[in-house]
Curated annotation (Swiss-Prot):
It comes from Sphaerobolus stellatus (strain SS14). It catalyses: (2E,6E)-farnesyl diphosphate = viridiflorene + diphosphate. Belongs to the terpene synthase family. It comes from the Eukaryota. Mg(2+) 1 binds at D93. It is an enzyme of class 4 (lyase). Disulfide bonds: none annotated. A motif (DDXXD motif) lies at residues 93-97. This is Sesquiterpene synthase M422DRAFT_47084. Mg(2+) 2 binds at D93. SUPFAM superfamilies: Terpenoid synthases (SSF48576).
Amino acid sequence: MPLLSCSQTFRLPPLHETFSVFPDNGLNPNYNACRAQSRAWISKYNVQVCGPKMRAFMDNCNFELSNAYVYPYAQPAGLRATMDLANILWLYDEYTDMQTGEDAAKAAVTVSKTLLNPEYDDDTWICHMMRDFYVNHIQKCRPNVAHRFIENFCRYTEVVGTEAKLREKNEVLDIPGYVALRREISAVRTCFDLVEYCLDLDFPDYVHKDPIFVIGYNAAMDLVFWANDLFSYNSEQAKGHAAANVVTVIMTSKKMNLQSTVDFIAGFCEALTFQLLDAKRALSLHEDPTFSRDAVRCLEAFGDWVRGNDAWSFATTRYFGPENKIVKETRIVKLKAPVEESVALKE
């Protein structure tokens, strides 16, 4: 188990300073119109799953705003797709957090059957939601992007079942094992697939297998989930779900206290940032414009994701509640008592 800290607070690192090396491209101007459309769409499904308190909580989190931060360049159709995906992921995550490993595995089967065969219908809300998303967006993607998205989304739902089983056992993985798992359960791969869609790119497999591109891709993906784990740690430890969080993993593996772990994460995020920048520079020297132009543009867009994700985390109440702006200014997080201010799915 992780070492306990006598302190009831911890100080967040200034990740916004680390991520300031990525340009600030502002908010997507299509935000308001796409947000209204996406919220109306997801409401058809969350009303079947969530109680009124949870729906109000999810509305206040404003997940759609995150997409305006991380896809500042997207045209309306692309931005709407990213918002719908974000709403799917948050709803699916909240739903499976309350499921056993067996039930989460059943949900994954429904997702896979639906995405691989849109004619499939088991009359569940998950099936109908995923079929809608496929028809509205994925069938409009170019072929390589569509194939990768389906593969990555199905993999995500399969691994969520693994996470649920670990949660049942309260098992804490080692650092390499957790990083490998988190790259899949974070669903960032599916979000990066939509980066290609929004940029009207359709990379062949050899780009995604290129060692330098992989380094940049993985660095960006890890930056997103390390930051998310850091920001969500307080809520997760209060709900008893912190075993599947990089903070707990490092505390346990390295026998560090909480603040030392947070500082370690800050240093690691700096190293990952340099990896992403170095990969972009290396690809810019490539003779093939698929790499020197298109792959570089994609990594630049991943930088939007990293910086925008950090900015949204303090613009929303998702992680820090109504104190989000105070936490942004002071960087001080007060540890919640168990289940304090936790909203159950059916409430």
